[in-house]
Amino acid sequence: MLISPACWRKFLKPRMATFISDLKAINPRLKIAYHSDGVILPIIPELIEIGVDVLNPIQPAAMDPAEVKRQFGKQLCFWGTIDEQHTLPFGTPADVRREVVARINTIGENGGLILAPTHHVQQDTPMENFWAMAQTITGTPYGSRQYRGHAAGHLSGC
């Protein structure tokens, strides 16, 4: 986090809670996505409390995606999880494929995953790694229409 959890609680949480509450009063089916880089484990329960539905990005270098899923997977959908700091730019295509499959098998279990890099694919990412990610996603059950429908049902539209 760029600010301490205490500062987040004091300055941002009350305003976010009001904003999210107002939005969901207008449309109760609305899904709220929250983006924050780094380690945000201390505030995840409070994000859930104020109405956040989707958490982005879940950086593997900062937080263990499997542990975050274990703790909060029934309340949140996770967007990201493919390591843009190490695996995509510096790994091999085989490393990328292994990571994609691992994320599908752990974070994607029972739905609640929007599988993507943790950030924009950076310029230093080899195209072979980008294509390994894309082809592995689309070549697995996760990339099929049937599975996407199953995953989406996990959080009523996540």
Predicted regions and their residues:
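Active-site loop segments of alpha/beta catalytic cores
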Residues: 1-158
